[in-house]
Amino acid sequence: MENRWQVMIVWQVDRMRIRTWNSLVKHHMYISGKAKGWIYKHHYESTNPRVSSEVQIPLGDARLVITTYWGLHTGERDWHLGQGVSMEWRTRRYSTQVDPDLADQLIHLYYFDCFSESAIRNAILGHIVSPRCEYQAGHSKVGSLQYLALTALIKPKKIKPPLPSVKKLTEDRWNKPQKTKGHRGSHTMNGH
């Protein structure tokens, strides 16, 4: 029988970012209580020897699974140390990979207090609303003018330690798109 390969998108991540992510997740699961219901699995609880940790985040009937890996093939540079992370959205019989922005948005739909756009209408109607958003990483677009005005009045409160953001976990120098040099900076185009 031949080998069957499964291709996954794995974001290359610095080892220290993975340690920080795991620490933040465990802090908010066990100490602050903001990540209630999240499941943290250690490397020894996985059958895959490449998995270093797994965080399962319940999202209604589905769940978001953030898996960190070690011992992967290194990248082009010396600092690509073979560490990585993948994000997967799973429901009963279906799963798909998601990017860090979408992962943060999915987390924010179910967790952490937020001052959302619907709060503007509620504030106008005289209802009590949450004054700030705890999880800024869950917002990817610029809000309406009213939303921006209200957020300018009420500064976001810094939470120590910060809430775990998947986007922040994958944010690194080798995951950013490469900037190409202009005509002046390219040696091959100048003939030098």
From Swiss-Prot:
Residues 151-164 are annotated as: Multimerization. The record marks 150-151 as: Cleavage in virion (by viral protease). Residues 164-192 are annotated as: Disordered. GO terms for molecular function: metal ion binding; RNA binding. Residues 75-114 are annotated as: RNA-binding. A motif (HCCH motif) lies at residues 108-139. It is found in: Host cytoplasm; Host cell membrane; Virion. A motif (BC-box-like motif) lies at residues 144-153. Residues 40-44 are annotated as: Interaction with host APOBEC3G. The modification Phosphoserine is found at residues 144, 165. It is a peripheral membrane protein. Induction: Expressed late during infection in a Rev-dependent manner. The keyword Membrane applies. Zn(2+) binds at residues 108, 114, 133, 139. GO terms for biological process: viral life cycle. GO terms for cellular component: host cell cytoplasm; host cell plasma membrane; membrane; virion component. Keywords: AIDS, Host cell membrane, Host cytoplasm, Host membrane, Host-virus interaction, Membrane, Metal-binding, Phosphoprotein, RNA-binding, Ubl conjugation, Ubl conjugation pathway, Virion, Zinc. Residues 151-180 are annotated as: SOCS box-like. Residues 14-17, 74-79 are annotated as: Interaction with host APOBEC3F. The modification Phosphothreonine is found at residues 96, 188. Belongs to the primate lentivirus group Vif protein family. The BC-like-box motif mediates the interaction with elongin BC complex. The HCCH motif (H-x(5)-C-x(18)-C-x(5)-H) mediates the interaction with CUL5. Counteracts the innate antiviral activity of host APOBEC3F and APOBEC3G by promoting their ubiquitination and degradation. Acts as a substrate recognition component of an E3 ubiquitin-protein ligase complex: mechanistically, Vif hijacks a host cullin-5-RING E3 ubiquitin-protein ligase complex (ECS complex) and the transcription coactivator CBFB/CBF-beta to form an active E3 ubiquitin-protein ligase complex that targets APOBEC3G and APOBEC3F for polyubiquitination, leading to their degradation by the proteasome. Homomultimer; in vitro and presumably in vivo. Interacts with viral RNA and Pr55Gag precursor; these interactions mediate Vif incorporation into the virion. Interacts with the viral reverse transcriptase. Forms cullin-5-RING E3 ubiquitin-protein ligase complex (ECS complex) by interacting with host CUL5, RBX2, elongin BC complex (ELOB and ELOC) and CBFB/CBF-beta. Within the ECS complex, Vif interacts directly with host CUL5, ELOC and APOBEC (APOBEC3F and APOBEC3G) substrates. This is Virion infectivity factor. It comes from Human immunodeficiency virus type 1 group M subtype B (isolate JRCSF) (HIV-1).
